[in-house]
Amino acid sequence: MYTDRKFQAYPDAKVYVVPYEEFQKMDLNDTETKHTCGQWVNLWEWPSIEAFHNHCALLHYRYERIPPRIIATSDMPAFFMKNFKLRPEFFEINQNLSRCHTEAYEFWAETQMEHFKGDEEKVRLDIDSFWDNHLGSYDDVEDFADSVESDPVRYELDVDVTGMTKEEMLASEEFMSCFIYGGEYNYFFKKPNW
């Protein structure tokens, strides 16, 4: 069991788990009924989706062949859920991303979700994809262009900006379309292969 919560991205995250057989009987449109057939499970205790599923199998020993379903979450972004199941990337992010980077990660994930709406299989939530695309936080686009001008190789953009001035970059449609930015602290990311 993993217990070092202070370094986790979502230390208070938990999910309400119900056995699959009970889930099949539920009317999910009925928001009035309080479901009591499940149990809240703290996610900070589990280092992987496998460990989480093993724990859930122990809670509902008769139903261990089919993973349980999750009908409620607390203190975690909704994009970690898919078809009433927890995405395995949650555990990787929770164990390996600091709390100070969660806002940037959430902006990046939500931007992908919006872009790939209807084709969510293309969305990448793993930590390696996050860091591969993360460019930093800047005051504005001009500040970002200044930084790229001073060290173009560092950013590994899909556009060759070697020798370009800040003004040339800002006037270049290719440069302006190779990144996305936003969020509370102006997070900049390479545009995934859109």
Language model regions located:
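A residue-identity detector for tryptophan
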Residues: 40, 44-46, 108, 131, ...
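N-terminal ordered "arm"
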Residues: 1-59
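Acidic, proline/glycine-rich low-complexity IDRs
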Residues: 3-13, 29, 149-194
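Mixed-charge (acidic/basic) macromolecular-recognition segments
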Residues: 53-151
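Intrinsically disordered, low-complexity segments enriched in small/polar residues
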Residues: 36, 116, 134, 161, ...
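Intrinsically disordered, low-complexity coil segments
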Residues: 23-36, 64, 115-122, 168
